[in-house]
Design a protein with these regions (language model features):
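Glycine-rich phosphate-binding/catalytic subdomain of phosphoryl-transfer
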Residues: 2-226
């Protein structure tokens, strides 16, 4: 609509597109794709109890904003919705899912849901096992690996715009389905790409709702620092 009004052109096709949004937070869904609780954003710092357990358990800093912290806090709170979990994701992951039908996430955004193994570029399997052991006595029907989004790397296929997604973007129906869509990413990874700060020993600073630095290390940290 904006293109049509400003330039007099009807937009029907785009070479490719992608979605970026705030990282972290918690959007849980059941088997029928119903949102189980209102979106808990990265600013909902309500997970101190969870992070006090997860950080030493994983041997890695787990900030309160991370999705796994929100999930475990909901478990500690005894929240009824947890038993009905079928999938949880970030805001970018949700929008991408609505546009493509694919429950995937770019590796950068995924790293704010659960720690990533830099060798496999997948969720850290050892830490996932530790989490499963931690909640084993709760006897949930789900396993963590089954409810997290699948990870996609830059350049990998992450789906294409469906007819339903095209209608959401353009209610006029002029935008065509089939447009390839990149893996959804978070604001931090988007800033890294925008500033060409993706090589080892480079970094960038982002300033907006919060101020943070993204630094690409040349090796893993040997320990976490409280």
């Amino acid at each position: 609509k904006d293109v049509k009004e400003q330039y007099g052109e009807i937009l029907t096709k785009i070479g490719s597109m992608g979605f970026s949004a705030m990282m972290h937070g918690y959007m849980p869904f059941d088997e029928e794709d119903n949102l189980l609780v209102p979106f808990r954003t990265w600013r909902n710092n309500i997970t101190e109890q969870a992070t006090d357990v997860l950080t030493p358990l994983f041997g890695q800093q787990i900030p309160q904003r991370w999705s796994i912290a929100h999930l475990y806090q909901a478990i500690l709170n005894g929240e009824d919705h947890v038993k009905d979990l079928a999938f949880f994701t970030t805001l970018a992951g949700y929008i991408h899912w609505r546009m493509t039908g694919e429950k995937v996430l770019g590796v950068g955004d995924a790293s704010g849901m659960f720690p990533i193994d830099p060798k496999t570029k997948q969720y850290d399997a050892v830490m996932m096992d530790k989490f499963e052991d931690l909640i084993a006595d709760r006897h949930f029907a789900w396993h963590l690996a089954d409810i997290l989004p699948e990870i996609r790397l830059a350049g990998e296929s992450a789906g294409s715009l469906t007819a339903e997604g095209a209608k959401l973007l353009d209610p006029s129906g002029e935008l065509e389905a089939g447009i390839p869509i990149a893996p959804p990413e978070g604001d931090a990874g988007t800033g890294m790409a925008a500033t060409n700060s993706v090589k080892q020993r480079t970094g960038n600073v982002s300033a907006g709702t919060s101020v943070f630095a993204m630094v690409v290390l040349d090796k893993e940290l040997t320990k976490y620092y409280p």
